[in-house]
């Protein structure tokens, strides 16, 4: 498999239904099984690529600790970011302008997801989903790492890396893309502001790739400070059906050149490898 693109010969409705039906499990309607908006809508299943793609296409994501059964969530409200609305702070712009760091796409997925899985006490700060459960090894345990690494191998899960001027990985993020939406999973930083630069890089990449919404799942102060907003679950699911049927640029290991951090503030898009 690879990232789905509607070839134009299939109606958007049929295309969306095809993606939703990929898995072998029938997920329930969130509004029916969770009318109070607590967030959890199903228990069980597996983390096979087809199951995950089907779940994400229906607005669900897995969230569970290592010693718990697989739980599927569709929170109310939903935290999202529109790439065109993102405005970095003045201090981050100043930092980027004088930085000698660079960003890459899909060059160190294994390292990024491993760094995101480390407890904060290890000197690694995991920023994206602070509201999610943090156990001994956080919620990104071996089963999750294996599942998303396979999604990466199949072309769905993607990472953005931040490298310092000595070539050390100091920050990054990962998530998956279906059509015109990117589902953010987690990000980390070892050096100050590295995850903010990774997020800015994601916004730039999405803006120039026809990815019109980034799903941040659960709101927290960090995300809201970056310009995220919340949507009702109903509104999010309505937009999701439209977005997953949209075509967007293909992201793979060699699709984009490294991006010097000072270029984040320019109008120049993240350059493709031609």
Curated annotation (Swiss-Prot):
InterPro entries: Acyl_CoA_acyltransferase, Leu/Phe-tRNA_Trfase, Leu/Phe-tRNA_Trfase_C, Leu/Phe-tRNA_Trfase_N. GO terms for molecular function: leucyl-tRNA--protein transferase activity. Its main location: cytoplasm. It is an enzyme of class 2 (transferase). It comes from the Bacteria. The keyword Transit peptide does not apply. Keywords: Acyltransferase, Cytoplasm, Transferase. Pfam families: Leu_Phe_trans (PF03588). The keyword Transferase applies. It catalyses: N-terminal L-lysyl-[protein] + L-leucyl-tRNA(Leu) = N-terminal L-leucyl-L-lysyl-[protein] + tRNA(Leu) + H(+); N-terminal L-arginyl-[protein] + L-leucyl-tRNA(Leu) = N-terminal L-leucyl-L-arginyl-[protein] + tRNA(Leu) + H(+); L-phenylalanyl-tRNA(Phe) + an N-terminal L-alpha-aminoacyl-[protein] = an N-terminal L-phenylalanyl-L-alpha-aminoacyl-[protein] + tRNA(Phe). Its EC number is 2.3.2.6. GO terms for biological process: protein catabolic process. One of its GO terms (cellular component) is cytoplasm. It is found in: Cytoplasm. Belongs to the L/F-transferase family. Functions in the N-end rule pathway of protein degradation where it conjugates Leu, Phe and, less efficiently, Met from aminoacyl-tRNAs to the N-termini of proteins containing an N-terminal arginine or lysine. This is Leucyl/phenylalanyl-tRNA--protein transferase. The gene is aat.
């Amino acid at each position: 498999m690879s990232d789905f693109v509607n070839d134009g010969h299939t109606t958007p409705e049929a295309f969306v239904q095809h993606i939703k039906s990929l898995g072998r499990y029938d997920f329930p309607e969130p509004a029916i099984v969770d009318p109070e908006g607590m967030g959890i809508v199903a228990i069980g299943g597996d983390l096979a690529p087809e199951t995950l793609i089907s779940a994400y296409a229906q607005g669900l994501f897995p969230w569970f600790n290592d010693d718990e059964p697989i739980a599927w969530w569709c929170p109310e409200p939903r935290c999202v970011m529109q790439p065109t609305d993102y405005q970095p702070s003045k201090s981050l712009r100043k930092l980027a302008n004088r930085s000698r760091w660079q960003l890459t796409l899909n060059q160190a997925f294994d390292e990024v997801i491993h760094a995101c899985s480390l407890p904060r006490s290890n000197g690694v700060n995991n920023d994206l989903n602070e509201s999610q459960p943090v156990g001994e090894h956080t919620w990104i345990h071996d089963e999750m790492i294996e599942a998303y690494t396979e999604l990466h191998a199949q072309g769905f899960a993607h990472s953005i890396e931040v490298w310092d001027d000595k070539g050390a990985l100091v920050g990054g993020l990962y998530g998956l893309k279906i059509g015109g939406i990117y589902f953010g999973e987690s990000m980390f930083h070892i050096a100050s502001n590295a995850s903010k630069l990774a997020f800015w890089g994601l916004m730039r990449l999405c803006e120039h790739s026809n990815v019109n919404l980034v799903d941040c799942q659960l709101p927290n102060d960090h995300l809201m400070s970056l310009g995220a907003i919340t949507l009702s679950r109903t509104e999010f699911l309505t937009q999701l059906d439209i977005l997953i049927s949209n075509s967007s640029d293909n992201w793979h290991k060699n699709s984009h050149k490294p991006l010097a951090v000072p270029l984040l503030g320019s109008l120049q898009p993240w350059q493709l490898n031609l």
